[in-house]
UniProtKB/Swiss-Prot annotation:
This is Protein ENDO16. Glycans are attached at residue 228. The gene is ENDO16. It comes from Strongylocentrotus purpuratus. It comes from the Eukaryota. Keywords: Cell adhesion, Developmental protein, Gastrulation, Glycoprotein, Repeat.
Length: 265
């Protein structure tokens, strides 16, 4: 039996503890020994089990599984979109908030075209989202995070901020056909709960969790948008469609919202 083990080691080039039993399917003990070695190196990696559970999935499900487990602090859409504008923030999410918002300011001054990426970035990150609103439209700052984008579209005051919304429609990806405000409705819910409370300055008493929280901005938007009716009509229909989706995702737990954003992003 000693000779057999030596032979096995020479043939397989595997360093394994003797004695080896030779079965029809190779060295069972060898494979176990090797596995225990690899497991000992993996102990520090808490993602190993998650990784294995992901292996059972396919396609988008697998991708989502990886994204959930390998970026535990942030929805994956944020990780991806951070890379689109400033790659340096991909690695660290928490620092990403700071450098992201700085990156936005410099990009904003460079070109309006890159603002689409900004709006995509900030769909996932709540704090910079608030900053972007206050930088982008000063007069709308206190209206709440969701509404300024609707206002920009319906009032059409600033070409800059309007372009922000329009290109946000594409990069956000919640629905290619929707007008800007619609997509902001679909994409923002994740940030809504915090951002609304931070930026509202007491102007909107509604709680963002309740359907009423969305009702307020719509009514205001419609009354403001009366000046340019065609745009209002165009905006209004998808708004109602998205509104129900938005309410669903708001009323459910944050993980569902993250999933919804991953789907759209």
């Amino acid at each position: 039996s000693e000779y057999a083990s030596e032979l096995a080691q020479a043939d397989n080039n595997v360093l394994a503890p003797a004695p080896l039993t030779f079965g029809g399917r190779g060295d069972i003990r060898t494979s176990k020994a090797v596995k225990s070695i690899s497991e000992s190196t993996v102990v520090s990696n808490y993602d190993e089990d998650n990784f294995r559970s992901c292996c059972a999935l396919f396609g988008e499900a697998q991708l989502k599984c990886f994204q959930m487990h390998y970026s535990p602090n942030a929805p994956s859409s944020q990780m991806e979109s951070e890379g689109s504008a400033n790659p340096s923030t991909i690695g660290s999410v928490s620092e990403g908030y700071v450098s992201e918002s700085q990156g936005q300011e410099s990009e904003r001054s460079e070109s309006e075209g890159s603002e689409g990426e900004d709006s995509e970035e900030t769909e996932g990150a709540e704090e910079p989202h608030e900053q972007m609103e206050s930088e982008g439209g000063d007069q709308e700052e206190s209206e709440g995070a969701e509404q300024p984008q609707e206002q920009m579209e319906s009032e059409g005051q600033e070409p800059e901020s309007e372009e922000d919304v329009d290109s946000g429609e594409i990069t956000d990806g919640s629905d290619m056909n929707m007008p800007g405000p619609g997509s902001s409705d679909g994409g923002v819910p994740l940030g809504l709960t915090e951002v609304d409370e931070q930026t509202s300055d007491g102007e909107e008493p509604e709680e963002p969790e309740e359907p009423g929280g969305e009702q307020g901005p719509h009514e205001q938007m419609e009354s403001e948008g009366e000046g340019n009716e065609s745009e209002e009509e165009e905006v209004e229909e998808p708004q109602e469609v998205i509104e129900s989706e938005g309410q669903q995702s708001e009323s459910e737990d944050p993980e569902k919202e993250e999933e919804e954003e991953e789907r759209s992003g």
